[in-house]
Swiss-Prot record:
Functional note: UDP-glycosyltransferase; part of the gene cluster that mediates the biosynthesis of the gamma-pyrones fusapyrone (FPY) and deoxyfusapyrone (dFPY). FPY is an undecaketide and thus likely synthesized by the polyketide synthase FPY1 from acetyl-CoA functioning as starter unit and the addition of 10 malonyl-CoA extender units by successive Claisen-condensations.
Descriptive protein name: UDP-glycosyltransferase FPY2
Domain of life: Eukaryota
Family: Belongs to the glycosyltransferase 28 family.
Pathway entry: Secondary metabolite biosynthesis
N-terminal signal peptide: 1-20
């Protein structure tokens, strides 16, 4: 007996390939099983599906982000700082710049759903509008996160919010000061976050959309492109699953100049800070100087640096390289690879470089994709987070024993050289052991994308069967006859009828009252009975005395 096939709509808007690739990798499995995959995004981002030919149709649900706006946004994010008023203000401004696309996305998604009638929505965690339309149309939904979601599933042993921790990831070995620091972060940052909350409420009110109720557990599927070993283990409900690292089965091979460079060196440091990070000249010069010192001391013999055009654009390339070992070159000459120990490019086939035996260390911004790839290919890291979840990822890497963490505000050339020497010389045995351990865990975890596809199908079929009418069956019948039912009202768009049972993966506690959940009524009854027994006992004792 074959299972019914569904139409799945993937939604990625302000996120890039780091956000879309894990979702589309899972969808490639679903497409192979016969499901139809559509993709919704902002104008100008259609290229996100270029490597995924199974995507049937691309829908535009919002305006393009101009190159100028995009650069301005990431320059703002590159100043990320949790500990200053200006830094917190910039963080909130960046979040609001992303969220400003919510009205366009909300209206665009409603139109796409009305015209195409998907059976399931699979969205990136940035797309708040997907949650709203799924609630409105009663659609099953999955969300992909790079880490545990914030403001959900709190644990007593985890202080603070995931993604916002700066000092400690758990309370296990943390001082009382560090625990208080993490636990009070939102309180100390309240003025900035309240501004965002009020702004968001006003934006939703303008569209006539009520605030979504906040739950301690999600009422939809949550996947994380991460794995335990990086993430702190915690109790999670059946709707939440770490399924990472999600990686493509194939990747671009080495060729041309980069292949020649890698094959003619034995101890290469790969340097890459991602597509969106914009490094200022001070940081770039300190990294160059630190790497030059490492080359001079013989710890490494070559550097492959994928330096984005945006970061290059911040530099005066006519000046001499501010390093004792490279002062005979200008920045422009160094970027043109006129020193045989250095290879610069705006893009390199990162996974192929990491997989090569010559690559022995990775200097990275600790972005989710880069970290997953580095662990999977067994390369230790010097991790320097620049913004967002990169900051806490460096803490996780340090705890896992596969990286030395540097602070973007305080590091210098000497600290970078020391970090490289620590990994490759001083603590080499410890790092090799931990890298091997994490690599093997990641290799097993990379198979979980098939499990994620299974869970999506399971949730889809449960959702379809827990109402009076099966939409998948109705669609199958209408396709054989005269077409699916048309409706102008969103509530009637999917004629499911009455809800007969709850989600089978949802734990019952979220549907229970606080009194029943905590057995307050049972405790109250117990104390009443205890009081009655005590009163009867006392009364009987008094009667005996008489």
């Amino acid at each position: 007996m074959s299972l019914p096939k569904a139409q799945i709509l993937v939604v990625v808007t302000v996120g890039g390939s780091t956000n879309s690739a894990p979702i589309l990798e899972i969808c490639s499995i679903l497409a192979a099983r016969g499901h139809t995959i559509d993709f919704a995004t902002l104008s100008g981002r259609q290229k996100l599906v270029d490597n995924y030919p199974f995507v049937k149709k691309v829908h535009i649900v919002g305006p393009a982000i101009s190159a100028e706006e995009d650069e301005k946004h990431y320059i703002l994010f590159s100043r990320w700082n949790w500990n200053t008023a200006r830094g917190k203000r910039d963080i909130v401004k960046g979040k609001m710049a992303f969220d400003a696309f919510w009205p366009f996305t909300y209206r665009g998604l409603k139109e796409v759903i009305t015209t195409t009638k998907p059976d399931f929505i699979f969205s990136d965690f940035h797309v708040e509008a997907a949650l709203d339309v799924c609630n409105e149309f009663r659609l099953p939904h999955a969300v992909m996160w790079p880490q545990m979601p914030w403001l959900m599933m709190p644990q007593k042993y985890i202080p603070g919010q995931p993604g916002m921790q700066q000092r400690c990831l758990t309370s296990e070995h943390a001082s009382i000061y560090d625990r208080l620091f993490e636990m009070t972060f939102l309180l100390r940052s309240a003025p900035f976050f309240l501004h965002w909350i009020f702004w968001t409420k006003a934006m939703r009110r303008k569209e006539g959309v009520a605030p979504r109720p906040r739950h301690s557990k999600p009422d939809y599927l949550v996947f994380m492109n991460n794995f335990y070993g990086m993430e702190t283990p915690r109790d999670t409900p059946p709707l939440v699953h770490p399924v990472g690292p999600i990686l493509a089965d194939s990747y671009p091979a080495l060729d041309g100049d980069i292949k020649s460079f890698v094959e003619t060196h034995q101890k290469i440091a790969l340097v890459a800070f991602g597509t969106h990070v914009i490094l200022d000249d001070g940081k770039i010069f300190k990294i160059i100087d630190g790497l030059a010192d490492a080359i001079s001391s013989g710890v490494i013999d070559g550097v492959v640096w994928a330096l984005s055009a945006r970061s290059r654009g911040q530099l005066d390339t006519s000046i001499r390289v501010p390093s004792l070992h490279l002062s005979h070159l200008t920045i422009d000459q160094l970027f043109k690879n006129q020193d045989q120990a250095w290879h610069f490019a705006t893009w390199v086939p990162q996974r192929s470089v990491l997989e090569h035996d010559s690559t022995i260390i990775f200097v990275t911004h600790a972005g989710p994709s880069s970290v997953n790839e580095s662990i999977f290919h067994g390369v230790p890291m010097v991790a320097m987070g620049i913004f967002g979840d990169q900051m806490v990822t460096t803490l996780r890497l340090e705890r896992s024993g596969v990286a030395v963490r540097l602070d973007k505000e305080t590091f210098d050339a000497a600290s970078l050289t020391t970090a490289i020497r620590t990994i490759l010389l001083f603590d080499k045995e410890s790092f090799q052991r931990n890298v091997k351990r994490m690599k093997r865990i990641a290799m097993v975890g990379s198979r979980k994308k098939h499990f994620a596809a299974n869970v999506i199908e399971e949730h889809l079929y449960d959702w379809d069967g827990r109402f009076e009418n099966s939409i998948l069956d109705l669609k199958a019948c209408s396709n054989r006859k005269r077409g699916f039912l048309q409706a102008s009202n969103s509530k009637d768009m999917y004629p499911r009828g009455k809800e007969l049972r709850p989600m089978h993966l949802q734990t019952p506690d979220v549907r229970m009252s606080w009194i029943k959940l905590n057995n307050i009524d049972v405790a109250l009854l117990f104390f009443i009975l205890l009081g009655i027994i005590s009163w009867i006992t006392r009364a009987a004792a008094n009667m005996v005395r008489l």
